[in-house]
């Protein structure tokens, strides 16, 4: 009964998340398709990691143009927490990672998140240790103010890194007084 109520309440959101998956055209046998590529990359990152990662949440920032001041004055923007993961670099130099992280959210309540991240990586300098990345993360989170119901997430990723240290970030889109949050963390590879 409770699950049915949630599905009815969030039908539009669920439909918008599922519709793009249904609209993907079929692919030829020679091309394994985006979904098989995705699942192969997740599996390879799970089975053959090159690194183990420590995630340290650094900042959340609520876009001031999208919030009432009295709300932002109450929100936590120091997301204390920690996370762990494993990652690898593919033959094109792109980053793949699996991670679990828990941090204090805007209401200073614990929020877990876990998933897969991918970034196309550029090394614009002669020093290959310096890199920039753009990509996405697909995962699941849960929040206190939503009764810790698992919520799927598909968010953009961007990063700047040098050697084993990377400053990685995302933006959670939203409406007025909801979402519109910049979230960033440090990732250290071991």
Curated annotation (Swiss-Prot):
EC number(s) given by UniProt: 2.3.1.251
UniProtKB keywords: Acyltransferase, Cell outer membrane, Membrane, Signal, Transferase
Sites annotated Role in lipopolysaccharide recognition: 71
Location in the cell: Cell outer membrane
CC per GO annotation: cell outer membrane
GO MF, any single term: acyltransferase activity
Disulphides: none
Site keyed Role in the phospholipid gating: positions: 176
InterPro entries, sorted: LipidA_acyl_PagP, OMP/PagP_b-brl
Predominant cellular place of this UniProt entry's protein: membrane
Keyword Signal: yes
Reaction(s) this enzyme catalyzes, per UniProt: a lipid A + a 1,2-diacyl-sn-glycero-3-phosphocholine = a hepta-acyl lipid A + a 2-acyl-sn-glycero-3-phosphocholine; a lipid IVA + a 1,2-diacyl-sn-glycero-3-phosphocholine = a lipid IVB + a 2-acyl-sn-glycero-3-phosphocholine; a lipid IIA + a 1,2-diacyl-sn-glycero-3-phosphocholine = a lipid IIB + a 2-acyl-sn-glycero-3-phosphocholine
Active site location: 62, 105-106
Gene Ontology BP terms: lipid A biosynthetic process
Signal sequence, start to end: 1-29
Family to which the UniProt record says this protein belongs: Belongs to the lipid A palmitoyltransferase family.
Oligomer status and interactors: Homodimer.
Record-given protein name: Lipid A acyltransferase PagP
């Amino acid at each position: 009964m409770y699950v049915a109520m949630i599905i009815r309440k969030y039908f539009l959101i669920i439909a918008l998340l599922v519709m793009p998956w249904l609209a993907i055209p079929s692919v030829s046998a020679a091309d394994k398709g985006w979904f098989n590529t995705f699942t192969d990359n997740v599996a390879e990152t799970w089975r053959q990691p090159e690194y183990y990662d420590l995630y340290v949440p650094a900042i959340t920032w609520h876009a001031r143009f999208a919030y009432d001041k009295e709300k932002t004055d109450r929100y936590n923007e120091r997301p204390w927490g920690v996370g762990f993961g494993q990652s690898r670099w593919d033959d094109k130099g792109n980053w793949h990672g699996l991670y679990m992280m828990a941090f204090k959210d805007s209401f200073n309540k614990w929020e877990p998140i876990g998933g897969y991240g991918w970034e196309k990586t550029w090394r614009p300098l002669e020093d290959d240790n310096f890199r920039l990345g753009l990509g996405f993360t697909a995962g699941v989170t849960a929040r206190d103010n939503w009764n810790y119901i698992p919520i799927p997430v598909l968010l953009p990723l961007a990063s700047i890194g040098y050697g084993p240290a990377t400053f990685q970030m995302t933006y959670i889109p939203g409406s007025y007084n909801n979402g519109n949050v910049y979230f960033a963390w440090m990732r250290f590879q071991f």
